């Protein structure tokens, strides 16, 4: 009887050990980020989900953006997203190629004005021509 209890205890600890072992090679997608940094989270495997125009949170990209994009009033993928949310008429995409979404503005000129105050001029050229 004691050996059965001991065997059960060993199996329990072995199972817990498998789940609690830290994955040494894993990349952490947590923390604060800026959508203007390249790559924004220190790894191209993570995405920066903006909480504001210049600050966001690093997240694993799978499934997070679709939910966040719908919930956040200023995140957009197109001008139609901004109009649908009532946040503006122009989706100004971040000048960072690692960020696949943008921020809603009232107009293209407002987006260019805001981004020109934040980003280097060479990054802004790619936004204006897009």
Curated annotation (Swiss-Prot):
Major component of both the cotyledons and embryonic axes of mature seeds. SUPFAM superfamilies: omega toxin-like. InterPro entries: Albumin_I, Albumin_I_a. Residues 1-26 form the signal peptide. Disulfide bonds join 29-46, 33-48, 41-58. The protein sequenced in PubMed:3755437 was probably a mixture of the products of genes C and D, PA1b being of C origin while PA1a is of D origin. PA1b binds to basic 7S globulin (BG) and stimulates its phosphorylation activity. Involved in the signal transduction system to regulate the growth and differentiation as a hormone peptide. Toxic to various insects through binding to a high affinity binding site in the insect gut. This is Albumin-1 C. It comes from Pisum sativum. The lineage of its organism: Eukaryota, Viridiplantae, Streptophyta, Embryophyta, Tracheophyta.
